[in-house]
Structures are given as structure tokens and as C-alpha cells.
Swiss-Prot record:
Keywords: DNA recombination, DNA-binding, Transcription, Transcription regulation, Translation regulation. This protein is one of the two subunits of integration host factor, a specific DNA-binding protein that functions in genetic recombination as well as in transcriptional and translational control. It comes from Pseudoalteromonas translucida (strain TAC 125). The keyword Transcription applies. One of its GO terms (molecular function) is DNA binding. It comes from the Bacteria. One of its GO terms (biological process) is positive regulation of metabolic process. Belongs to the bacterial histone-like protein family. NCBIfam families: himA, PRK00285.1. Heterodimer of an alpha and a beta chain. GO terms for cellular component: cytosol. This is Integration host factor subunit alpha.
Length: 99
């Protein structure tokens, strides 16, 4: 199951008691700040959670899997996520409990 923005807004409504529209607006504003910072080339550091970074990938050779034709894969910038140690620990502990 996936956690959606609507799910996050619902949790804010239930746990903090803010109305649903404000919760939805808060979630949208949070993600818009992240998008905006990444568009500007900034790193995002969420303490206890992890970091979102931008990485430039160079052009590289590729191959069309259907035809076998060589095609270049263009250079691009990608977003990467590196989980923080606290998140890694919680996931590892949660995984061992689930077994």
C-alpha cells in the first residue's frame, strides 16, 4: 500500500485536529517548498529523515531493447534521496519486527 498526500492530510486532521482543507493545503505547501528548492538546485535536509540531492548524469550510450539499435541517453539532472541514520534504524527495526 502506498501513502498518498491525501493520507498525510487525513493523518494531520486526525492527530492535530486541523480542518481537512487546512491539512490538505499544508501538505501541498510542504511539497511545493521541496519542489521549489530542488528547482533552484538546493539540497533538502530533513533532520531525522534524510536528504534530497540533485545529481548531474552525463550522456551515456544506451540500446533500444526491441531493435538493439544504439541510442544515446542524454545528460540530465536527477533527484536522489539518502535516508538518514534514524530512518534507516527505524526501518531496520520495523522490518525485523514484521518477520
Amino acid at each position: 500500500m502506498a501513502l498518498t498526500k491525501a493520507d498525510i492530510a487525513e493523518h494531520l486532521f486526525e492527530k492535530l485536529g486541523i480542518n481537512k482543507k487546512d491539512a490538505k493545503d499544508l501538505v501541498e505547501a510542504f511539497f511545493e517548498e521541496i519542489r521549489s528548492a530542488l528547482e533552484k538546485g538546493e539540497q533538502i535536509k530533513l533532520s531525522g529523515f534524510g536528504n534530497f540531492d540533485l545529481r548531474d548524469k552525463k550522456e551515456r550510450p544506451g540500446r533500444n531493447p526491441k531493435t538493439g539499435e544504439d541510442i544515446p541517453i542524454s545528460a540530465r539532472r536527477v533527484v536522489t534521496f539518502r535516508p538518514g541514520q534514524k530512518l534507516k534504524t527505524r526501518v531496520e527495526v520495523g522490518t525485523s519486527k514484521a518477520k
